[in-house]
């Protein structure tokens, strides 16, 4: 689905790493696919809802609390800052909206949750394709600018629970409006007719509401005449006031000189000043000196006619909290240099660890290859031994068969030799038997 079909809203984060500006991340929000989720994220970006649940409903000042290289960066915990808090603009949590969208490319904006229908304010930005999250987390936007900032956060050193060692803070955030929309609204406002005949340039330069023009339309000529007439009257009044003021000042100076002269004459006639008058005058002088050098609340004496009276009540507006936060981030040159040295030292340690890790991986790979070669040699040796043993067994079985065949052949030869002997022995037996019978006959005859 093309981006213009998914949504047309934009939001941004201004990121700082250890108090140093790192850049801006701009998001394209898919409000056509996930309107509730996008509205929740947009409201937290603008902070338009103010305070909710005892915390300001804004991502400003929150941190990225979890960073996993090759996977994602996670933030949005506006209450605790460690991944255990947060809430939504609809309540504690709200339901999953569109789980059909896939995590099929990097730098997608998705909602973090603790299970089905537990979306709050936490979110994460993927750095790789993560299909195992499909159907579990709602994708509602993507990064369209500031990929290098996401990579910089992803490559930070992390500690326990994948928390980055450096503080990654959202210093400013909000919604972006396209220029075409602003120009269109301005043109529409300019094309609207004015409700009255009074122009902005004809309004009087006074704050008194009762001295303003009436809203009835008048001709341009009459307005100019009235304007010139008022200016002439104002000039005449100013000149007369200046003249009367000079007269009053001159009369007051002459009267003060006359009073001083009469006082001096009386003092000359009396020859001395009474004790009570001296005491009153000294008391007035002391009180005047006290008023002139009255200390303020912080103990600083201010010279003048009296104490400062404009420090009593605070009538001005208070300093905005984000100004105070920015003011607290000011660093001295020594602190900045120390921070830079610590950063360089961490970078060196990280580079050293990477080097050691690469060496260890190379060593392990070499050992693995050697073990594999050794196993291959042992396997070949065992196969050679089995083949040799098989050959020896074959030779022994052949020898046994040959011996058996030779033995059977010799037995056959012996049996063949015994048969003629038996044949030759049988006539001898017959002849011996006949001779014995004849001898027995002869013996009987002789008897």
UniProtKB/Swiss-Prot annotation:
UniProt cross-references to PROSITE patterns, sorted A to Z: CSA_PPIASE_1 (PS00170), CSA_PPIASE_2 (PS50072)
Catalytic activity from the UniProt record: [protein]-peptidylproline (omega=180) = [protein]-peptidylproline (omega=0)
Compositionally biased intervals (Basic and acidic residues): 215-234, 255-301, 323-399
Region of interest (Disordered), ranges: 186-447
Molecular function, one GO term: cyclosporin A binding
Segments forming a coiled coil: 326-401
UniProt keyword annotations, A-Z: Coiled coil, Isomerase, Rotamase
GO cellular component terms given for this protein: catalytic step 2 spliceosome; cytoplasm; intracellular membrane-bounded organelle; nucleus
Biased composition (Low complexity): 432-447
Keyword Isomerase belongs to the record: yes
Any one GO biological process: protein folding
Alphabetized SUPFAM superfamilies for the sequence: Cyclophilin-like (SSF50891)
Protein function: May catalyze the cis-trans isomerization of proline imidic peptide bonds in oligopeptides. May play a role in the protein folding, transport and assembly.
Protein name (Swiss-Prot/TrEMBL): Peptidyl-prolyl cis-trans isomerase 8
Organism name: Caenorhabditis elegans
